[in-house]
């Protein structure tokens, strides 16, 4: 039996209206529709409109359109109801078809129509049509309608026509926060974040209070330009206005502090959040990774898993980046196991992080397998493979990948050639390096960067051709930076040209007056040359400026745990065994005729003390732990935050020969693969 019974004619319209309002299923609505037809009311636009709105409430867009199309003379209100339903259900092209039907039938346009149609133009990528509607809006007398004009403003902003958008903005009376947001979005979409921030400040000065959505958007603009001052001004404004900081606002604040390197503040905001979603955790983890806090990034990732949150692509990438920084290969591979491998192979963002991790852990053979398995590749992935192969000594293979890039129709960029040139530097391939360097501008019409010049200086310096290297620096179209001068300094070390090294270090000190390492190296050059007074002057200058040498840290991963060492570090539980192992190795090296190279320690330290300090540099302690904790034949992988000193480099070669172990050390410049008494860098780094 039907639940719908339409009574006498005098009250049936009112009762149908009531039945429509209380209908709780689509079947109820269909029964009402049947009753309308039976009582010849299916052309009553008022009742049909009520029924249509109710069907749209249940997202029955096809049935709604059926009701509409069977109405003999649909009016503008019926059109507006269906247009509103279509827009809310993301049927933007269908919305535009309805609008064209309105125009075809010559119906009077309602102020409610334009905002919806203009929104559909934006979402259907029909902005040209939206701009064309501007004259119609004016013609129909809606040029003072805030909703219609704000929708037009969104069209102009989204099209990048910001001058026109601003003119329109100035014409709108009683601008609401929605109007300001529309113009603001245009600036951010066009990458003009600084102007967007200034617009927000102007809005606040005019007494318009932003909503939380706007706050998130302006904080995101601050993130893009690294504007911490404006970000903190916004936070202060929110506190003065007693605005609540929801999770979106707080997460964006975490992102801002992380972008600006203020990790303590980022963590403070993070810890203050009662509820954190995966986006918040990922933001904090990536912040640690990008600000050189890899241990904290890994710890937070593990804590996130304890909260039963499934990692997303951003948290995984942050975790892998942290593992890459520490050379924590086993830990990284454990993290990979948390995500389906197919997802890595189809997600370019994650695949890039995975290849980068393998490359930085000295396991590029595994990274290259990932690269080969990927069906789709872009220039970022190609560059990751080229750079990873080159830095791990597989230079010819990196050239082959470059050839594959061209065959796939992928255009190389500056990073592509940077990877290729790094490979040429590490392998000493001068002619190949010159070929790639010239191809950057002559073949591919790309602009050479200071990093490209730095590689060429490094290449000449490696060959001992310091005159060519220095000439290239003088001919550079831009001012040489610390990378370029540092490359020349490496060449000076190779040929022991202390005079040029002194000149280079003075340039480095001028560029990086805060870098204590440059002062230390200059002091050591003076001391080696017997220029004690000048060496003392440099040290006095350091003391007056309160400068201290950056401590050298080394890390080694064993069974998923990262162990950290400083020079002369005795904090490790196995310190006694570590030092005993180094003592045994030292005795064997002395029997082989090895004498420590004490020039790598400050000159004002006694010779015996110099040898003791050198003997316990952080990388030696890490290697010793690896030797006593792993099986014979297992590769030992160590990461150091600074350049490996000359003495440690010689010691590593001898240890690899004595123990018959492969030792891979990644310093802040390159990989060193020590095997059977030799290093892959050929003693140039």
UniProtKB/Swiss-Prot annotation:
GO biological process: RNA modification
Keywords (A to Z) from UniProt: Repeat
PPR repeats: 75-109, 110-144, 145-175, 176-210, 211-245, 246-276, 277-311, 312-346, 347-381, 383-412, 413-443, 449-479
One term of GO molecular function: zinc ion binding
Coiled-coil regions listed: none
Superkingdom as given in the UniProt entry: Eukaryota
Segments of this protein annotated with the region Type E motif: 484-559
Alphabetized InterPro entries for the sequence: DYW_dom, E_motif, Eplus_motif, Pentatricopeptide_rpt, PPR_At4g14850-like_plant, TPR-like_helical_dom_sf
Span list, region Type DYW motif: 591-685
Keyword Coiled coil on entry: no
PANTHER family hit by this protein: PENTACOTRIPEPTIDE-REPEAT REGION OF PRORP DOMAIN-CONTAINING PROTEIN, PENTATRICOPEPTIDE REPEAT-CONTAINING PROTEIN
Family of the protein in this entry: Belongs to the PPR family. PCMP-H subfamily.
Protein name in UniProt: Putative pentatricopeptide repeat-containing protein At3g08820
